[in-house]
């Protein structure tokens, strides 16, 4: 038995009333929607209003994305040949510190436009789409948000402390409550005789009101896995990780002289390789770089990583 059920026919009068009702609502909605409904968000406000647009989510993935953005800025510095060490430390108070021995974010006054007179470092940390990767000769290669990224981290943090060693001097600046400067960038002394001569240190404490769903506690394993991959992909770069949180203290350093050759060996370490030597090829042409490593094993599944 097949039975078809149709809705009762609509009375013509009822149909006209419905159309008139919809038309009236549409006209009213159009009349209510005007220039006053258009919002213009300045500074870092857009990031705090819609953080998911910038870091993907406000869960644990988004929380760890803050670390990736700060670290990726330094990786670009390393790829440009100006840095060979990155340090990432999870501090006891829940904050994260990322330090490097790169050139140090510029500290001189910004030369033009609405930000004229502010230090370049303040502009980089408080203005979206500000950085050295969008043009000029500062960087040949870059990835991630960068420039945007560090300012996004500032916007989504309860507190940020910036320290720069450059030109023999140590500069510092602090931000609070979503990137509001506590004071101007200032010299606090000479660069210490021991240790790095130039570089940048960014220490940030994620804002718990932004990451309310899953909290602001970093997962060491998540950080370590990402850092190891970065070390494989950036041959010779030293990436030092430390966890100073009580009961979870550890220190791990990644550095791979063989780059992606070591990466392939690592991926194949639990498999039976058909050849002991990893095939490797690299070349550069017109600014484009190619780096390939291959090793066959007895398995049936291919693994392509890039």
Features from the language model and the residues they span:
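GHKL/Bergerat-fold ATPase module in large chromosome/replication-associated machines
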Residues: 241-306
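Bergerat-fold GHKL ATPase/HATPase_c domain
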Residues: 16-68, 123
């Amino acid at each position: 038995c097949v039975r078809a059920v149709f809705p009762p026919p609509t009375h013509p009068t009822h149909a006209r009333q419905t159309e008139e009702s919809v038309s009236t609502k549409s006209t009213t909605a159009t009349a209510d929607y005007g220039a006053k409904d258009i919002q213009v968000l300045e500074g870092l406000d857009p990031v705090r209003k819609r953080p998911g647009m910038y870091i993907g989510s406000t869960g644990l993935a988004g929380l760890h994305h803050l670390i990736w953005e700060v670290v990726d800025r330094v990786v670009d510095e390393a790829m440009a040949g100006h840095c060979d060490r990155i340090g990432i430390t999870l501090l006891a108070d829940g904050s994260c510190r990322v330090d490097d021995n790169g050139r140090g974010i510029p500290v001189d006054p910004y030369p033009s436009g609405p930000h004229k007179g502010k230090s370049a470092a303040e502009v980089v940390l408080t203005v979206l789409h500000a950085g050295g990767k969008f043009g000029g000769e500062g960087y040949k290669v870059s990835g991630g948000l960068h420039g945007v990224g560090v300012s996004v981290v500032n916007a989504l943090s309860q507190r940020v402390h910036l320290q720069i060693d450059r030109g023999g001097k140590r500069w510092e600046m602090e931000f609070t409550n979503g990137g509001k400067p506590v004071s101007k960038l200032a010299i606090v002394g000479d660069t210490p005789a021991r240790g790095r001569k130039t570089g940048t240190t960014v220490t940030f404490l994620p804002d718990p009101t932004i990451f309310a769903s899953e909290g602001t506690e970093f997962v060491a394993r998540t950080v370590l896995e990402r850092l190891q991959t970065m070390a494989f992909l950036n041959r010779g770069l030293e990436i030092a990780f430390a966890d100073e949180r009580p009961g979870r203290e550890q220190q791990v350093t990644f550095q791979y002289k063989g780059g992606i050759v070591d990466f392939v060996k690592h991926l194949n370490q639990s498999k039976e390789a058909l050849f002991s030597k990893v095939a490797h090829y690299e070349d550069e042409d017109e600014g484009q770089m190619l780096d390939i490593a291959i090793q066959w094993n007895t398995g049936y599944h291919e693994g392509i990583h890039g």
